[in-house]
């Protein structure tokens, strides 16, 4: 019963406890707990007694009121204070805190039950485990780092996208896909934009460019960093850190006066920030800071930059107050930039040891060597527009002259820079050009003498020839005459026989060794100022060929005439062969000025006295055929007596001594000298080419014509002069007198068809190539020299600017002026720097040369004038009418009063 009574007492006392529990649950937020405490006041001394959990079940009802001890703790945890609203705001702002509060509320209804203490312990354990799970779900600091995020960002796009591929970046989509805030993506994009890897298109829209322009951007930043003198500032700050006391006085002085470098530092000539004031937000943007941060690496000698130094430089540059808060902000922003640059593999983190310990720094591992001439030089090897060619031609030729004068085989001074500038800057004035080239004329003789002396002293002729014929490594070097025609894909032309056939390099190298000193198409080493705008062209079928880049002027001629005695001369002349090339070094002329100056040239050649002609020839003479180094203006024949002494004679004697060969002066038999001479410098001496024999078709019979081809000089009418020389040597009569004249028939052709033609020399072609359809209609090959020689060296002229081997891109014309005229040339002004004398070692093996002129069948001018009595040379539709000759006569009579009398061109031609 007693037990039951206790049970009844318990039942009687339960309702108020349940009411209290319900009231407590309903009014927990109303702080009504103090009412119960007042009722419990008499038993307060017992609440501090230790609680035995093992005896909790058998406690008497009198001791039950001590159970709300936890309620007192709740009172202290959740007071109603003015800051209670702050907790509500935090709970609303953070879902994590709100979730914690909900988890706590789940256990509150059972706090006052019998097992309240055990449940409270379980509550604490569950709460801790929930926090641990939440921490596991939250990403770590490394996972949230900007560097790792940038790597994920860069992995979405190719480093080197195709030019046709256009990639647009949406920052919203990227932020959602990567699960980060958009501001983090903005930080990455701003740094990438500073290096021009991306560009802004619209709001939150960027275009991806990749790393194509990164080297150029870094080079520009390096130049800007050098202008801003960042290297000096870094050195100053490092010295200041080492000796802080020494710099205090300097700082006080600097406070009083403004820094002289501030205007330069504020001037940031980036196209993206035209107005970069010191305190503008744009100057403090992450993009500008990134560019300046990269500049510090590029101008640093050690390529290591600490963030402290970088922050100080940027703070001083932006004229901010150097307080600690701004410094920490700068360092924090520089860390963000450094993380992105690290992801780009441009820098890496290192540690620098100082007096106070190790300090983190960053080292540049990106590209370092930026060539300063990348965007200054023009790649002339690639096909460029004609306008660009005209602009850079003078610069290329000017550089060619400088390198030519510094060649090791010469002992001459370089011409003055002012004269070179005058020559290049006034290409439209023929008279100025003659004055400009007069300075070079003093060097020509000595150069020719030196090269001739070296050739005579060298006994191993074949080795010498092969040594001189090998191309030099530099593609822009004027001394590199023989680029390989079969290597590059750009070396394409219209074939002579409408076939595109290539020659091997071994054949190309074997040709000078076989024929370099035997007169079979040797090409001078340093005579070629390579015109890189013209590229090698296709060749004839399976023949080793020699490529000569097209010079502004070509004279092509062949070997010796019949009947020459082998022992009549010593021959210091053309050991190099029957055809030589001297590249012109003058820039091309506008075509509009060529017509006027061509007629002037013919008038001056007719009317210039022999004395002035001789004096001018002394100034503008040609070089030796063997090793011409400077532009030459005429080709003549030297006597064997002067040829013997030519090597050791000074350059004045080289220009002035014995002008006629012994064969011409004594027996009328003359050598046919062939070389390519540059006529750009002296337009008045363009047609001063002496041929010892005139064309005589009746006596020579079926033998092909021999001629000299003279390409038009700069500023003239685009006319080429062809001087046939197949006339019998007995037909040449030399009158007795100090200034005898020689009557030579010549042909005037429009030069646009021949202006860009390279010369292809082959020693293996047994006969003339006449089966190919010629651009000049029915033009047979022209042979030079002895017809009875076994092998012939063929000089093939083809258009130079060919894109397709089957089609010609050069516009060509039929002859505008074809007419026989007699050129009365004075032998006194003749010179034979490149003549092959009968006694020379090259005399016996000098072959004939076949010259073919190729031209597209479409004429530039509608007129097709035909020479009636020279049908074997050029057979073209139309006829060579008298109006052309009458026009010449009018031009000659119009300028008959001129004191410069050079040539007498008669109206009637000689056969």
From Swiss-Prot:
Biased composition (Polar residues): 669-687
Compositionally biased residues, Gly residues: 566-579
First-listed, main subcellular location of the protein, grouped into a coarse class: nucleus
Disulfide bridge map: none
Region span, Disordered: 239-281, 409-433, 565-706, 873-911
Keywords attached to this entry: Activator, Cell cycle, DNA damage, DNA-binding, Nucleus, Phosphoprotein, Repressor, Transcription, Transcription regulation
One function term, GO molecular function aspect: RNA polymerase II cis-regulatory region sequence-specific DNA binding
Localization per Swiss-Prot or TrEMBL: Nucleus
Record-listed Phosphoserine modification sites: 94, 409, 840
Annotated DNA-binding residue span(s): 141-210, 281-366
Positions with biased composition (Basic and acidic residues): 243-257, 415-424, 599-621, 688-698
The protein's assembly and partners: Homodimer and heterodimer: mainly forms homodimers and, to a lesser extent, heterodimers with E2F8. Dimerization is important for DNA-binding. Interacts with HIF1A. Interacts with MN1.
Function as written in the Swiss-Prot or TrEMBL entry: Atypical E2F transcription factor that participates in various processes such as angiogenesis, polyploidization of specialized cells and DNA damage response. Mainly acts as a transcription repressor that binds DNA independently of DP proteins and specifically recognizes the E2 recognition site 5'-TTTC[CG]CGC-3'. Directly represses transcription of classical E2F transcription factors such as E2F1. Acts as a regulator of S-phase by recognizing and binding the E2-related site 5'-TTCCCGCC-3' and mediating repression of G1/S-regulated genes.
Protein name, UniProt field: Transcription factor E2F7
Organism field: Bos taurus
């Amino acid at each position: 019963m007693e037990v039951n009574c206790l049970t009844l007492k318990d039942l009687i006392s339960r309702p108020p406890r349940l009411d209290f529990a319900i009231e407590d649950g309903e009014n927990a937020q109303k702080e009504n707990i103090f009412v119960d405490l007042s009722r419990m006041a008499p038993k307060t001394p017992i609440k501090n007694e230790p609680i035995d959990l093992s005896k909790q079940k058998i406690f008497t009802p009198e001791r039950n009121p001590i159970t709300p001890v936890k309620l007192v703790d709740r009172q202290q945890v959740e007071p109603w204070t003015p800051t209670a609203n702050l907790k509500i705001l935090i709970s609303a702002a953070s879902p994590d805190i709100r979730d914690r509060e909900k988890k706590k509320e789940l256990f509150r209804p059972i706090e006052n039950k019998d097992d309240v203490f055990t449940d409270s312990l379980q509550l604490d354990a569950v709460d801790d485990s929930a926090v641990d799970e939440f921490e596991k779900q939250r990403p770590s600091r490394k996972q949230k780092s900007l560097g790792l995020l940038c790597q994920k960002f860069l992995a979405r796009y190719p480093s080197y996208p195709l030019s046709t591929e256009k990639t647009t970046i949406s920052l919203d989509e990227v932020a959602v896909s990567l699960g980060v805030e958009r501001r983090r993506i903005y930080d990455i994009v701003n740094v990438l934009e500073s290096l021009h890897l991306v560009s802004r298109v619209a709001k939150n829209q960027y275009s991806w460019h990749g790393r194509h322009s990164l080297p150029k951007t870094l080079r520009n930043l390096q130049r800007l960093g050098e202008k801003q003198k960042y290297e000096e500032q870094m050195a100053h700050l490092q010295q200041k850190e080492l000796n802080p006391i020494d710099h205090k006085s300097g700082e006080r002085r600097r406070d009083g006066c403004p820094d002289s470098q501030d205007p330069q530092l504020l001037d940031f000539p980036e196209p993206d920030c035209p107005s970069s004031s010191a305190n503008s937000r744009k100057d403090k943007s992450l993009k500008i800071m990134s560019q300046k941060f990269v500049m510090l690496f590029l101008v640093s000698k050690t390529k290591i930059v600490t963030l402290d130094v970088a922050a100080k430089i940027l703070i001083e540059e932006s004229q901010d107050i150097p307080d600690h808060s701004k410094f920490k902000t700068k360092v924090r922003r520089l860390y963000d930039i450094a993380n992105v640059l690290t992801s780009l593999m441009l820098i890496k983190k290192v540690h620098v040891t100082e007096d106070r310990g190790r300090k983190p720094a960053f080292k540049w591992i990106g590209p370092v060597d930026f060539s300063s001439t990348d965007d200054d030089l023009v790649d002339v090897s690639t096909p460029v527009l004609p306008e660009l060619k005209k602009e850079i031609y003078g610069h290329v030729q000017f550089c060619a002259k400088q390198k030519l004068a510094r060649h090791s085989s010469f002992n001459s001074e370089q011409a003055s820079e002012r004269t070179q500038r005058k020559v290049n800057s006034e290409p439209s004035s023929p008279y100025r050009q003659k004055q400009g080239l007069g300075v070079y004329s003093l060097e020509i003789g000595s150069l020719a003498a030196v090269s001739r002396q070296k050739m005579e002293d060298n006994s191993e002729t074949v080795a010498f020839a092969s040594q001189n014929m090998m191309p030099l490594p530099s593609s822009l070097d004027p001394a590199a005459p023989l680029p390989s025609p079969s290597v590059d894909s750009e070396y394409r032309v219209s074939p002579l026989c409408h076939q595109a056939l290539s020659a091997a390099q071994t054949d190309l190298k074997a040709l000078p060794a076989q024929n370099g000193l035997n007169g079979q198409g040797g090409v001078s080493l340093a005579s070629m100022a390579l015109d890189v705008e013209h590229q090698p062209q296709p060749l004839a079928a399976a023949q080793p060929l020699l490529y000569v880049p097209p010079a502004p002027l070509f004279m092509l001629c062949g070997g010796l005439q019949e009947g020459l005695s082998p022992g009549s001369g010593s021959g210091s002349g053309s050991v190099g062969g029957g055809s030589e090339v001297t590249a012109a070094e003058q820039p091309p002329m506008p075509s509009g000025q060529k017509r006027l100056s061509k007629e002037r040239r013919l008038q001056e050649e007719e009317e210039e006295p022999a004395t002035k002609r001789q004096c001018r020839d002394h100034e503008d003479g040609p070089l030796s055929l063997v090793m011409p180094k400077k532009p030459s203006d005429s080709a003549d024949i030297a006597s064997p007596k002067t040829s013997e002494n030519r090597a050791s004679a000074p350059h004045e004697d080289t220009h002035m001594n014995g002008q006629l060969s012994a064969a011409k002066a004594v027996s009328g038999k003359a050598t046919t000298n062939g070389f390519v001479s540059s006529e750009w410098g002296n337009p008045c001496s363009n047609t001063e080419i002496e041929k010892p024999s005139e064309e005589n078709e009746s006596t020579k019979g079926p033998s092909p014509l021999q001629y000299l081809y003279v390409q038009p000089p700069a500023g003239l009418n685009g006319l080429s002069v062809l001087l046939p020389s197949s006339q019998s040597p007995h037909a040449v009569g030399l009158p007795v007198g100090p200034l005898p004249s020689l009557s030579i028939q010549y042909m005037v052709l429009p030069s646009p068809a021949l202006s860009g033609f390279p010369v292809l020399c082959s020693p293996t072609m047994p006969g003339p190539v006449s089966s190919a359809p010629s651009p000049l209609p029915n033009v047979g090959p022209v042979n030079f020299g002895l017809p009875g020689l076994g092998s012939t060296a063929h000089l093939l002229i083809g258009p130079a600017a060919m894109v397709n081997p089957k089609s010609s891109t050069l516009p060509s014309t039929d002859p505008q002026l074809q007419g026989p005229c007699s050129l009365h040339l004075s032998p006194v002004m003749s010179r034979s720097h490149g003549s092959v004398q009968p006694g020379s070692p090259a005399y016996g093996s000098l072959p004939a040369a076949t010259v073919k002129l190729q031209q597209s069948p479409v004429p530039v001018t509608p007129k097709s004038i035909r020479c009636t009595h020279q049908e074997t040379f050029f057979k073209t539709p139309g006829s060579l009418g008298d109006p052309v000759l009458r026009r010449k006569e009018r031009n000659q009579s119009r300028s008959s009063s001129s004191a410069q009398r050079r040539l007498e061109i008669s109206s009637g031609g000689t056969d």
